[in-house]
């Protein structure tokens, strides 16, 4: 059990959750006493919370089924007659099977337990497990342990309770042998029971014993798990925010690329209509343009014209601010003269450079400014 801290709620905790209530807590083999809120601030995770047996009803019942999926559903009906309180108000935890086939069951007020856990969760220190102090006593038979001015009674039998020395003669005959007791040397021994003296701190000793049933079951099991995840919420929130931003950026980028593609397609279609005004229906620009090239491949000057235009169309279509106002073809010289208009001289120069890089012979004639645009004669081929 080393490495796991432990916090013990005293019998007075049955009055209700109180951050100022003094509790004992064990860490690194040392026991300290402090208000519950202060202990939470100092305790190191993971840690176990020990409930006083006074807050818990322990009983042993016969369950109608051994199938795990039905056991929890049958618990309220099996223990209802053994509880003084309304079973609907109780949190039920299923323990191990006893030698006689019955199952140990623990019942604790749901609102009481939830209130103490809420204090721990509010401090960001939810316990890793929940145990009953009297359920963690070792050995076969009956085991008694002196803690906080009362005897805890546990062991391999069904009984889990706290009692005074004066109650032992009444309980002794119903407790299975062997009967053992552990206490500090100054504690008065019980009648008929050999008490083994403890030299160390009793809370440290109890925290080192094998654990009993973990009461963090059903809705409280989910509560403990959610508390463990709560520490990761800030990081998960950042990851989620990053994913949302990345998704939004991708959508915006796709939308922009779609718009850019639509714009290029519209410019290519406009250029095609200028070159082939007789084609009134434009269904597949690339296929129709290739068809014109194929039809006129052997038709002399027209084939040469279409060949030059086929090479230049992609480059010119990539400059959305450039428009072709006039086209002149000279079969004798083997060139195409385009009268183009652009918003500036730099755009014309960029167009000339791109045409040259595509393998075309290009000459840019003198350009003149007309208002906010520039007009120039562009000769391709020759």
Swiss-Prot record:
The record, for Pfam families, names:
GspL_C, T2SSL
Major location (coarse): membrane
Paired cysteines (S-S): none
Query: Which positions, given as ranges, span the membrane?
Result: 234-254
Per UniProt, subcellular location reads as: Cell inner membrane
**Keyword field:** Cell inner membrane, Cell membrane, Membrane, Protein transport, Transmembrane, Transmembrane helix, Transport
Write out the GO biological process terms.
protein secretion by the type II secretion system
Gene3D superfamilies noted in UniProt: 3.30.420.380, General secretion pathway protein M, EpsM
GO CC, sorted alphabetically, is: Gram-negative-bacterium-type cell wall; plasma membrane; type II protein secretion system complex
- Provide the membrane-side ranges marked Periplasmic in the record: 255-382
Q: How does it assemble?
A: Type II secretion system is composed of four main components: the outer membrane complex, the inner membrane complex, the cytoplasmic secretion ATPase and the periplasm-spanning pseudopilus. Forms homodimers. Interacts with XcpZ/GspM. Interacts with XcpR/GspE and XcpS/GspF.
Q: Which family does it belong to?
A: Belongs to the GSP L family.
- Which purpose does this protein serve, as stated in its record? Inner membrane component of the type II secretion system required for the energy-dependent secretion of extracellular factors such as proteases and toxins from the periplasm. Plays a role in the complex assembly and recruits XcpZ resulting in a stable complex in the inner membrane. Provides thus a link between the energy-providing XcpR protein in the cytoplasm and the rest of the T2SS machinery.
Task: Indicate what this protein is called per its UniProt record.
Answer: Type II secretion system protein L
């Amino acid at each position: 059990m080393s490495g796991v801290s432990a916090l013990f709620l005293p019998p007075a905790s049955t009055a209700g959750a109180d951050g100022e209530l003094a509790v004992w807590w064990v860490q690194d083999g040392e026991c300290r006493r402090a208000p519950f809120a202060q202990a939470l601030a100092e305790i190191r995770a993971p840690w176990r919370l020990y409930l006083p047996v006074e807050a818990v009803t322990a009983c042993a019942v016969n369950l109608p089924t051994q199938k795990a999926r039905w056991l929890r559903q049958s618990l309220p009906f099996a223990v209802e007659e053994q509880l003084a309180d309304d079973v609907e108000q109780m949190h039920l935890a299923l323990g191990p099977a006893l030698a006689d086939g019955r199952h140990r069951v623990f019942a604790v007020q749901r609102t009481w337990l939830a209130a103490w856990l809420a204090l721990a969760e509010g401090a960001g220190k939810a316990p890793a497990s929940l145990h009953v102090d009297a359920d963690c006593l070792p050995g076969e038979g009956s085991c008694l342990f002196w803690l906080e001015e009362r005897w805890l009674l546990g062991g391999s039998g069904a009984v889990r309770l706290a009692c005074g020395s004066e109650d032992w003669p009444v309980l002794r005959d119903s407790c299975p042998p062997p009967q053992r007791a552990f206490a500090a040397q100054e504690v008065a021994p019980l009648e008929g029971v050999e008490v083994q003296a403890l030299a160390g701190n009793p809370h440290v000793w109890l925290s080192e014993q094998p654990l009993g049933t973990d009461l963090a079951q059903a809705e409280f099991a989910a509560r403990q798990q959610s508390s463990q995840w709560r520490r990761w919420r800030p990081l998960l929130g950042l990851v989620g925010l990053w994913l949302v931003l990345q998704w939004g950026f991708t959508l915006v980028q796709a939308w922009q690329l779609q718009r850019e593609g639509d714009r290029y397609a519209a410019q290519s279609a406009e250029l095609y209509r200028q070159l082939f005004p007789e084609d009134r229906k434009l269904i597949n620009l690339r296929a129709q343009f290739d068809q014109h090239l194929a039809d006129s491949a052997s038709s002399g000057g027209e084939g040469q014209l279409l060949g030059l235009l086929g090479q230049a169309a992609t480059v010119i279509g990539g400059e959305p601010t450039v428009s072709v106002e006039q086209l002149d073809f000279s079969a004798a010289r083997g060139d195409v003269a385009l009268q183009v208009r652009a918003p500036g001289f730099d755009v014309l120069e960029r167009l000339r450079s791109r045409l040259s890089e595509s393998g075309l012979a290009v000459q840019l004639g003198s350009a003149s400014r007309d208002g906010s645009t520039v007009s120039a004669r562009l000769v391709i081929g020759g």
